[in-house]
Amino acid sequence: MSKYEEKRQLKCSFCGKNQDQVRRLIAGPNVYICDECVELCDEIIQEEIEDTIDEDTTSLPKPKEMMEILNDYVIGQEKAKKALSVAVYNHYKRIYSKKSSSKDIEIQKSNILLLGPTGSGKTLLAQTLARTLNVPFAMADATSLTEAGYVGEDVENILLKLIQAADFDIEKAERGIIYIDEIDKIARKSENPSITRDVSGEGVQQALLKILEGTVANVPPQGGRKHPHQEFLKIDTTNVLFILGGAFDGLEKIIQKRGGDKTLGFGAKIESKKELDLGKLYEKVLPEDLLKYGIIPEFIGRIPVLATLELLDEDALMQILQEPKNALVKQYKKLLELDDVELEFEEGALRAIAKKAIERNTGARGLRSIVESVMMETMFEVPSRDNIKKVIVTEKSVNEDSVNPIIVLKDQEESA
């Protein structure tokens, strides 16, 4: 057989067509595939990708469903919950759509800024969302961060926490959520760019810019500072959702000065910070206000979604104590139930706990420490005694350190 005839015998190993029947025949080790079969394979793969996108999008909770889940754990803050639900849904929808072959429109990432007083639920909102979506979650405190080369934590260490939360599964970590608290503490020390180095303020903002937008970062696997002889973990932050939280103490003055709240001028009533409704005032915040506060323009541009949280009042704190799925009252009742003891909180006691949290300016975050101090002596005593039927926490036991909750013995209740 001539070489020409041998060439004519070459055929696609999949469809059986000869070389002269197709535009191109691609050769592999003892196998051939034609351009038509390549196109067909590509179509099949794309169909499968579209199916997985549909499955992913179907399993992703809709904004209303996310809101319902948040309602189980977070009391109040309706506007913030709605804004978060929409932003998070759009973020993960964007990730799944990237699997598609469509390149016509690129949806940009929308990081989120939660602006609200201490103890208003910023951290809890972020944690609950991560748990709902079953994605890795990492928390960091902006106050510990410094610019690379200075004493403190590098921003890459935040990414290491996320990788650790994903059990070092990089692909999983790249779809995670990072919450950075106290972001207001890295504000520039003055509104104007400084000649001297601001390593814990503007320097940190500059260092965070790349990972907020999306970059392939080199992360030291053991944490700490980078050195040239160590191996690095590479993580792409393009699809990592960053939620930033801060109390932004003093921002209300900037908003008022701009005229965002009509409390200035002749005849205006001067209100103290406690009298001001910070939640409503913060709703009027503009990028220029954050700029004056000390957040650099590039940083503001990378956090397009802004959600404000309200200051929690006495009634809201009482609800937080009792209503969420993991409410503090339910937790302490469960703890005593394990010792076969019933626990009751009088309404006056709950209100007294809420008042103490407001006085301490700790919001919901301070509730646990107050309840813990009230219950300490009782919880020390109860496990050692088998004749206790019930414990009643009264208003007096909350307000007076020398008064403990009432202990009801089993024989006392029977005689009553």
Curated annotation (Swiss-Prot):
Gene Ontology CC terms: HslUV protease complex
A family per Pfam: zf-C4_ClpX
Residue ranges constituting the ClpX-type ZB domain according to the UniProt record: 1-53
Residues noted as binding ATP in the record, renumbered to the chain: P117, T118, G119, S120, G121, K122, T123, L124
Residues noted as binding Zn(2+) in the record, renumbered to the chain: C12, C15, C34, C37
PROSITE patterns according to UniProt: CLPX_ZB
SUPFAM superfamilies noted in UniProt: Glucocorticoid receptor-like (DNA-binding domain), P-loop containing nucleoside triphosphate hydrolases
Alphabetized InterPro entries for the sequence: AAA+_ATPase (IPR003593), ATP-dep_Clp_protease_ClpX (IPR050052), ATPase_AAA_core (IPR003959), Clp_ATPase_C (IPR019489), Clp_protease_ATP-bd_su_ClpX (IPR004487), ClpX_bact (IPR046425), P-loop_NTPase (IPR027417), Znf_CppX_C4 (IPR010603)
MF (Gene Ontology): ATP binding; ATP hydrolysis activity; ATP-dependent protein folding chaperone; protein dimerization activity; unfolded protein binding; zinc ion binding
Keywords carried by this UniProt record: ATP-binding, Chaperone, Metal-binding, Nucleotide-binding, Zinc
Biological processes annotated in GO: cell division; proteolysis involved in protein catabolic process
CDD domains in the record: RecA-like_ClpX
SMART domains listed in its UniProt record: AAA (SM00382), ClpB_D2-small (SM01086), zf-C4_ClpX (SM00994)
Function: ATP-dependent specificity component of the Clp protease. It directs the protease to specific substrates. Can perform chaperone functions in the absence of ClpP.
Family statement drawn from the similarity comment of this UniProt entry: Belongs to the ClpX chaperone family.
Subunit-structure text: Component of the ClpX-ClpP complex. Forms a hexameric ring that, in the presence of ATP, binds to fourteen ClpP subunits assembled into a disk-like structure with a central cavity, resembling the structure of eukaryotic proteasomes.
Matches recorded under PANTHER family: ATP-DEPENDENT CLP PROTEASE ATP-BINDING SUBUNIT CLPX-LIKE, MITOCHONDRIAL (PTHR48102:SF7), ATP-DEPENDENT CLP PROTEASE ATP-BINDING SUBUNIT CLPX-LIKE, MITOCHONDRIAL-RELATED (PTHR48102)
NCBIfam families: clpX, PRK05342.1
Protein name, entry field: ATP-dependent Clp protease ATP-binding subunit ClpX
Source organism of this protein record: Clostridioides difficile (strain 630) (Peptoclostridium difficile)
The organism's taxonomic lineage, starting at the top: Bacteria, Bacillati, Bacillota, Clostridia, Peptostreptococcales
Gene, per the UniProt record: clpX
